[in-house]
């Protein structure tokens, strides 16, 4: 009987003959922190997400906090949904903002755009929606709300890797910021990790700095261990090459994971 049980919660891991040689190459390359494998993973994600502005980070929660920082929510309020994991809302508090609850659509569990608009306040800095259960929110209505009131729209798409809205992948510039999780129980995992996509190239460039202390890793400057020019302080949110190696291997299996 035990042999016939369906492993409902078994984590997807690529075949060992694919994954282990790739991991071995990374582990013994001399570079296991943020490096070429992270860049490779981001480049591989771009066509999957329909967006060239892709930042790999160390968790979905970090992706959300980075998006909230880029949106400038500190000192204001964020209209969001109570129908979500605590990890959606904790970054709002971490960024010094106040969550304001909007009602949900009882048919989908997603945030109700009409009630979200009613809940806007003078100090509202962003709307934070969740694609509940992987079913996309009404992005047309939410982005319309954002455009009317000058408020950026952030999407927690932890459940929605591979989903589409209006024929475009979730992660495309249909939202100002889209955040994914690569934690252990998501569609694909990098053991832990996250992804942030941005609509605006300027937000992407700023986010690239803020995910690693605020230091420009691409600039020609003195060794950051002895001196660095940091115009704006940042976080330690970057992904490492070991996680990215797993991510690259996992992406090849995403279509079959989505069909399962």
Residue ranges and their predicted role:
Residues 88, 142, 207:
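Aromatic/hydrophobic pocket-lining residues that form π-stacking "cages" and hydrophobic walls in ligand
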Residues 31-77, 90-95, 101-103, 168:
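Phosphate-binding glycine-rich loop
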Residues 1-31, 36, 229-231:
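N-terminal "arm"/small-domain region of PLP-dependent enzymes with the aminotransferase-like
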Residues 91-92, 145, 187, 242:
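Hydrophobic/aromatic ligand-binding patch that stacks against planar heteroaromatic rings
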Residues 107-190, 195-203:
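Active-site phosphate-binding strand-loop segment of PLP-dependent enzymes
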Residues 160-167, 173-260:
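Active-site region of PLP-dependent enzymes
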Residues 22-23, 45, 63, 78-79, ...:
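Generic structural signal for small/hydrophobic residues in well-ordered secondary structure
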Residues 83-89:
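Conserved coil-to-alpha-helix start sites within the AMP-binding
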